[in-house]
Amino acid sequence: MGQKIHPTGFRLAVSRNWASRWYANNTKFAGMLKEDIEVREFLKKKLKNASVGRVVIERPARNARITIYSSRPGVVIGKKGEDIELLKAELQRRMGVPVHVNIEEIRKPETDAQLIADSITQQLERRIMFRRAMKRAMQNAMRLGAQGIKIMSSGRLNGIEIARTEWYREGRVPLHTLRADIDYGFSEAETTYGIIGVKVWVYKGDHLGRNDAPVVEEPQEDRRRRPGRPEGRRREGEGRPAGNRRGGAGAGRRAAPGADAKSGE
């Protein structure tokens, strides 16, 4: 079901792409996958204040190429590129191969689902009301071009004893449509009452494939055929004056048998 499945995994090879782009045999696959998970966790902690949306890892020919998508690339690079060099050295030590790090800027962070989720969790950790944070994020996303957004928060909201889930939606979020460009993000806020999870879905429009074209509606015929009846035929009695129809308003009752005979006598 589109409501339950992960939106990115549901649309892989249709409108989304993998975050790890490499091939490995059965003996090396598990180790490389674990390495990717550890690298992403390290970058998430290291670049917590750099507004990192996603990390793409590629492994071409005994090398590694890591692309970091951030709305604040200056924080990642640092003064005169010092921070990026230290980050590259640490990644090479962890992965054991030469690493190339690329930084890509996110032009509209207000419509990036992961950055929206991170922003809401940071506000929750600063004791800001969750409804205010969610509605403000939705307004900013719709103002900057998103066609729909849905935000869900789960946990001990506002410190209540029983955990609950609340969500808000604005615009359209068609989760069942494969061609729909749905951006999904998830983040957790560590509060004094416990962990609050935040999920964000952002609908940015539809993707058109290589051979697809916009649908053009053809003008419908004014005269439509009724199902089950040929067009040239009509029912018995149609088109006649009301008084001449059988059983109509002008038709009299049938005479009783023998009435003509009595009248002729």
From Swiss-Prot:
CDD domains: KH-II_30S_S3. Residues 221-239 have a biased composition (Basic and acidic residues). The keyword Iron-sulfur does not apply. Residues 211-265 are annotated as: Disordered. GO terms for cellular component: cytosolic small ribosomal subunit. The keyword Transport does not apply. Keywords: Ribonucleoprotein, Ribosomal protein, RNA-binding, rRNA-binding. One of its GO terms (biological process) is translation. InterPro entries: KH_dom (IPR004087), KH_dom-like_a/b (IPR015946), KH_dom_type_2 (IPR004044), KH_sf_prok-type (IPR009019), Ribosomal_S3_C_sf (IPR036419), Ribosomal_uS3_bac-typ (IPR005704), Ribosomal_uS3_C (IPR001351), Ribosomal_uS3_CS (IPR018280). PANTHER family: 30S/40S RIBOSOMAL PROTEIN S3, SMALL RIBOSOMAL SUBUNIT PROTEIN US3C. Belongs to the universal ribosomal protein uS3 family. Binds the lower part of the 30S subunit head. Binds mRNA in the 70S ribosome, positioning it for translation. NCBIfam families: rpsC_bact. Part of the 30S ribosomal subunit. Forms a tight complex with proteins S10 and S14. This is Small ribosomal subunit protein uS3. It comes from Cupriavidus metallidurans (strain ATCC 43123 / DSM 2839 / NBRC 102507 / CH34).
